[in-house]
Amino acid sequence: MASKRKSTTPCMIPVKTMVLPGASTEAQPVEPLPEGPQQDLPSEAPEASSEAAPNPSSTDGSALANGHRGTLDGYVYSCKECDFRSQDVTHFVGHMTSEHTDFNKDPHFVCTGCSFLAKTPEGLSLHNAKCHSGEASFLWNVTKPDNHVVVEQSVPENASSSVLAGESTEGTEIIITKTPIMKIMKGKAEAKKIHMLKENAPTQPGGEALPKPLAGETEGKEGDHTFINGATPVSQASANSTKPPHTANGPLIGTVPVLPAGIAQFLSLQQPTVHPQHHPHQPLPTSKALPKVMIPLSSIPTYNAAMDSNSFLKNSFHKFPYPTKAELCYLTVVTKYPEEQLKIWFTAQRLKQGISWSPEEIEDARKKMFNTVIQSVPQPTITVLNTPLVASAGNVQHLIQAALPGHAVGQPEGTAGGLLVTQPLMANGLQASSSSLPLTTASVPKPTAAPINTVCSNTTSAVKVVNAAQSLLTACPSITSQAFLDANIYKNKKSHEQLSALKGSFCRNQFPGQSEVEHLTKVTGLSTREVRKWFSDRRYHCRNLKGTRAMVPGEHGSVLIDSVPEVPFPLSSKVPEVPCVPTATSLVSHPATKRQSWHQTPDFTPTKYKERAPEQLRVLESSFAQNPLPPEEELDRLRSETKMTRREIDGWFSERRKRVNAEETKKADGHAPQEEAEGAEEEGRDEELASELRAPGENGSSEMFLSHTLAERKVSPIKINLKNLRVTEASGKSELPGMGMGVCEPEEDGLNKAVEQPPSRVSYKKTAQQRHLLRQLFVQTQWPSNQDYDSIMAQTGLPRPEVVRWFGDSRYALKNGQLKWYEDYKRGNFPPGLLVIAPGNRELLQDYYMTHKMLCEEDLQTLCEKTQMSAQQVKQWFAEKMGEETRAVADTSSEDQGPGHGEPVAVDKVLGDACAALSENSEAWEPSAPEAGSEPFDTSSPQSGRQLETD
């Protein structure tokens, strides 16, 4: 006995303990030696095997003896006449349809235990779910009673008894061995594997079944040595089937019998030299063993056991245990089960398999699983302008992720020839559908080597590649992830490529339209606010530069000229339509190929600086003679005839209208050119220009300024005419920029240009009161809303572009620490003469002043409460009031009039007290650097009043 125990394989069950009291009478007595040779017969006698198949009892018993009890769980479909056996209802129904045509006319599915008749397999499955919910194994046999084909269902008694014996509650638990295999991307082969394990394993020659093991012991073995597909491990199966206990003392190699085909295939995976027999079915690799999970059916009230045999559900679960919404919708259509029931079924399967993943793990597993599958994207477009295109398989990019928004396209280092986009797309060795990812390629001339960056817009699914120095859309073999632009990383710092795109647009138009801004946001990756802020800062910077050189783009390159205002630019067809604005960074010539960078977006048509053909000029001139402001229909006609873009036509008409107005102004005043030249020589004299353009009235609005006669004006008529022209014309994208677009307070740079080059926008001189209102709003908010803009426009009388421009300049000056008045306005310290007081409060203060002629300290708090003003504002009002009277007295009094008139001593005292803080910060009341000399305050200081008295 000791030797037998040592030589016996562990976990083996002695044969004499495997006999049940109610074993089949057809089972042979247990013989130690003959049992081995008997197992050699199933492959040689298929008839006997098929005859034994319809017997549920013997079939189940032999399966248990072979250690494959788990493979009988579920449905088993067999046809003994055709020697057909399967576990897939689809295959079984297909067999019945093709081989038994008479069965299709009147199908009968009978449950022998309940005498239930159904016409469809689904009806019988529903019956099983209702009446046999505790059963997990069913055997369908094809019989012919009275020459009529009938499918009879029987319940294997041994499977039921074993389940009942091993479980505490009858039919209340599902064992993990009843679940399908979770095999990724191998869904089509499960039926073969299950059929293989069940086809020959259950039977013995002549229909004799092996002794049945005890139910409890069988359950114990399965709990320890069960695969997730329901089969026992190879080592255990081979030991149970090939080595009876009576042969334990003998050599194993000499007594190994021929195994059944299903077990032999599993054995060949681990020990291919043990059994050389081949089987027509293709073997599958085994899976790792998972722990057995017991799930009470009471916890899943709506669980339908009939769903376990559905091939669609099993295949879907094998591919991925967490179905997506689209997969659930598909399964509801093909399986006719509601979505909620499908979710419950998948949840139960995951519980039985012991699968519990976090959302992050699910996404990670799905990405790893489908990393070679191009998921459907709603018509993305990848525009790749490449140089050159090389038809080499080694340069193929993996563009799968590029189809999704927010991903950039790169190229591995070490490849040459640029980026190659071909169809069909090859990714990781799989050929993808060419319709799911349309690719557009174009070729451009190869430029000189230059570092480039690739920018991908997060708002669209198109990938745009922008060249840096040449502004060409090229693909470089050495693109790395560090070259990709990220606005969140660089924040305020802009890359060379972004600056190139912004400067190129700035040379075209200092005030870009909405379409241009949207284009720049796509190209540079910056936000709309950042683009507009850059343009505002750039305009401010350009206007403050003196003596810079302007770059005029030519057809073959850029021409550098000195900005000499005295020399007018001659207007001829050979001169470019619009010169670039003088900038500090425009001193480098760029090749003409830079214009090609704007062709990547079909909606954005660039202005072409080239000579107009004679036939184009004839068509344009004839249209201009009919209507200087052509309607939309006329513009469409001109576009088709002249082959010019809309912007080019608008620019030509705008320049033509300016030229006509300039000629009319010349005729009206022949001395205008000389006065214009003299005015140009006075560039930089902000104070004189301010005195020329200051309105006679207090508000200084342009309307009052234009209301005076020509004799009263100190500005040449051509300037006024140009102002009227710019007020009436739209300042949208149809206006092309000139060279006088200023951003800071001295806004008369445009007046220094010749008649042929008028300013592109009107420049307004703001009075102290207007600036005061603007500054007050700026202190409240640096980014006014539309309502704020409307309110300040109504208060100041300034046009909206002027207000917007002033706010942009002020933000720029504040950022650079040049806004000296900001802190004083923030504290409420306003310059004298600019205090805005309600009429009722003004009358109250006036009455107090007429009574006391001065401000008493004890009355200050009372006045503040009555007028709702601060103490500083009240003191400021009294200081201004006394200063006005002091100046009036100084102007009207004679030399002998002494200080007895009024109380000048008290006045001096109060003025000194009220303006103590103001005198300390006298520089703070000066405007920012551009305003300092051009817009002095009209109100004289108290000190000047005292000086007049002493005189």
Swiss-Prot record:
Gene that encodes it: Zhx3
Organism from which the protein derives: Rattus norvegicus
| Acidic residues bias locations | 675-690
Renumbered residue ranges of the record's region Required for homodimerization and interaction with NFYA = 237-481
C2H2-type zinc finger span: 77-100, 109-132
Where is the stretch described as Disordered? 1-66, 198-249, 621-642, 661-702, 885-951
What role is this protein assigned? Acts as a transcriptional repressor. Involved in the early stages of mesenchymal stem cell (MSC) osteogenic differentiation. Is a regulator of podocyte gene expression during primary glomerula disease. Binds to promoter DNA.
- The biased composition feature labelled Polar residues covers 232-244, 937-951
One GO MF term on file is: DNA-binding transcription repressor activity, RNA polymerase II-specific
Sequence ranges of Basic and acidic residues compositional bias? 661-674
Where is this chain's protein located in or outside the cell? Cytoplasm; Nucleus
Q: Which domain of life is it from?
A: Eukaryota
> Residues annotated as DNA-binding region?
298-357, 487-546, 605-664, 759-818, 830-889
Q: Record's SUPFAM superfamilies? A: beta-beta-alpha zinc fingers, Homeodomain-like
What name goes with this protein? Zinc fingers and homeoboxes protein 3
Q: What family does this chain come from, according to its entry? A: Belongs to the ZHX family.
Q: Which InterPro entries match?
A: HD, Homeodomain-like_sf, Homez_homeobox_dom, ZHX_Znf_C2H2, Znf_C2H2_sf, Znf_C2H2_type
Give the CDD domains listed for this entry. homeodomain
